Swiss-Prot record:
Domain of life of the source: Eukaryota
Gene3D superfamilies recorded: MFS general substrate transporter like domains
This protein's name: Protein spinster homolog 1
Disordered: annotated span: 1-38
TM region positions: 60-80, 98-118, 126-146, 160-180, 187-207, 218-238, 278-298, 323-343, 357-377, 381-401, 421-441, 465-485
Length: 528
């Protein structure tokens, strides 16, 4: 009798709602796969059967999503590439200039939960098509604003957030429903390569198109045409895969979405999600500040060093720093994302907490190099570029890993909502306010000193040093994530397999058949 009670009970629930059928593959940890803490990974043929898409088609979908991700970030940082020209055209200071990015991010942040809710319940392909089409039209319209209507530029940049919100909350969940395990990590790394590459191309396209056309307005007219192509590719190539099927190893029965309020409560009780989102907020704070202000800081540094003339009203400002910083952003992004994913993948074989630990190492390592890049700017622009290169490489190690953490600690029917609220948190406390905050501190410091090009440089230099401190705080948040990551991942796996039932917030239970009856026991007794 003892033997019957201690048999592999987790696959023998007699209530169909209590768990999977006997022989169900891929139970997590020692309960279903004693050699691994991972779900059993379907092969290519299994993935094709489950999703209804060939591997080639699934890969092509990821390529289309990467193209759109690249385009989104290219558009965002095209503005940064011509920032000095915008300041001169509208006759605004650093504080008002910082509002351009802040208004965009704030709109994006407000709309993200809306698209997160819709993305967990409705066709994701059509949501993205509508959002990107609207974004393309608004971006084109923003290039025709006269100099006396700066407020209208702020309004249009805010409306651009519709496209970003419709895409960024949904696209990673499509990848999660097409691939699992290491395949998913690789595809996410490809997807997130588009962030630094797109950002760098934004700087380059903004500065070069302005030089060729002789007018910065033309820099804002490049991405709308590419956006039309993106909508066509989405409509023709992307197909909607069933949510969570690749993790259940079956196209049915589908996971049922819960209420939005239940989703929020579950996410708030997920420490790995909360802490990794706080860590990612630090990444957003630093990257948002550098994205907008680094080219302007480098230009001011070279003016102080006597390497370039100052940018005066009516002059065409030098674009070489935007070009160089754009190239650095591209290279460091590709290198950092690739290094982060590969290091994490190798360490994961020996340490299941590798993902948050690699993220922590990246942030804690980047902070001193970013500080050195600012401290050396008065003496050597070459040293500044070298330290920026190292710091941004370490910072970029986080992008794909943070996305992977979210996807494996959150169940499929909550992932778009989780993406949305990670976006809200990271932008609310990160890059929504950081460009404006840096500009505001710079303005306050500059007013306390006699007017000069040196005071402009020093004010921005001291204000940007805040980024190094925030980066260190983010590293601490990822160290906290490492304490909870194993249990939270296993809970998500149990839920996907149908073994974990959320009844009350403090009483998550799994079904354990004993002597022909279903008995509920606290999940804490299993998650050791």
């Amino acid at each position: 009798m003892a033997g019957s009670d201690t048999a592999p009970f987790l696959s023998q629930a007699d209530d169909p709602d209590d768990g999977p059928a006997p022989g169900h593959p891929g139970l997590p940890g020692p309960m279903g796969n004693p050699k691994s803490g991972e779900l059993e990974v379907p092969d290519c043929e299994g993935l094709q059967r489950i999703t209804g898409l060939s591997r080639g088609h699934s890969t092509l979908i990821v390529v289309v999503l990467c193209y759109i991700n690249l385009l989104n970030y290219m558009d965002r940082f095209t503005v940064a590439g011509v920032l000095t020209d915008i300041e001169q055209f509208f006759n605004i200071g650093d504080g008002s200039t910082g509002l351009i990015q802040t208004v965009f991010i704030s709109s994006y942040m407000v709309l993200a939960p809306v698209f997160g809710y819709l993305g967990d319940r409705y066709n994701r392909k059509y949501l993205m098509c509508g959002g990107i089409a609207f974004w393309s039209l608004v971006t084109l319209g923003s290039s025709f604003i006269p100099r006396e209507h700066f407020w209208l530029l702020l309004l249009t940049r805010g409306l651009v957030g519709v496209g970003e919100a419709s895409y960024s909350t949904i696209a990673p969940t499509l990848i999660a429903d097409l691939f699992v395990a290491d395949q998913r990590s690789r595809m996410l790394s490809i997807f997130y390569f588009a962030i630094p590459v797109g950002s760098g191309l934004g700087y380059i396209a903004g500065s070069k198109v302005k030089d060729l056309a002789g007018d910065w307005h033309w820099a804002l007219r490049v991405t709308p045409g590419l956006g039309v192509l993106a909508v066509l590719l989405l409509f023709l190539v992307v197909q909607e895969p069933p949510r969570g099927a690749v993790e259940r190893h079956s196209g049915s029965p589908p996971l049922s979405p819960t209420s939005w309020w239940a989703d929020l409560k579950a996410l708030a009780r997920n420490p790995s999600f909360v802490l990794s989102s706080l860590g990612f907020t630090a990444v957003a704070f630093v990257t948002g500040s550098l994205a907008l202000w680094a080219p302007a800081f480098l230009l001011r540094s070279r003016v102080v060093l006597g390497e370039t003339p100052p940018c005066l009203p009516g002059d065409s400002c030098s674009s070489s720093d935007s070009l160089i910083f754009g190239l650095i952003t591209c290279l460091t992004g590709v290198l950092g994302v690739g290094l982060g994913v590969e290091i994490s993948r190798r360490l994961r074989r020996f340490n299941p907490r590798a993902d948050p630990l690699v993220c922590a190492a990246g942030l804690l390592g980047s902070s001193p190099f970013l500080f050195l890049s600012l401290a050396c700017a008065r003496g050597s622009i070459v040293a500044t570029y070298i330290f920026i290169f190292i710091g941004e490489t370490l910072l970029s190690m986080n992008w794909a890993i943070v996305a992977d953490i979210l996807l494996y600690v959150v169940i499929p029917t909550r992932r778009s909502t989780a993406e949305a609220f990670q976006i809200v948190l990271s932008h609310l406390l990160g890059d929504a306010g950081s460009p404006y905050l840096i500009g505001l501190i710079s303005d306050r410091l500059r007013r306390s000193w006699p007017p000069s090009f040196l005071s402009e440089f020093r004010a921005l230099q001291f204000s940007l040093m805040l980024c190094a401190f925030v980066g260190a705080l983010g590293g601490a948040a990822f160290l906290g994530t490492a304490m909870f990551i194993e249990n939270d991942r296993r809970r998500a796996q149990l839920h996907v397999q149908g073994l974990l039932h959320e009844t009350e917030p403090s009483d998550d239970q799994i079904v354990v058949p004993q002597r022909g009856r279903s008995t509920r026991v606290p999940v804490s007794s299993v998650l050791i």
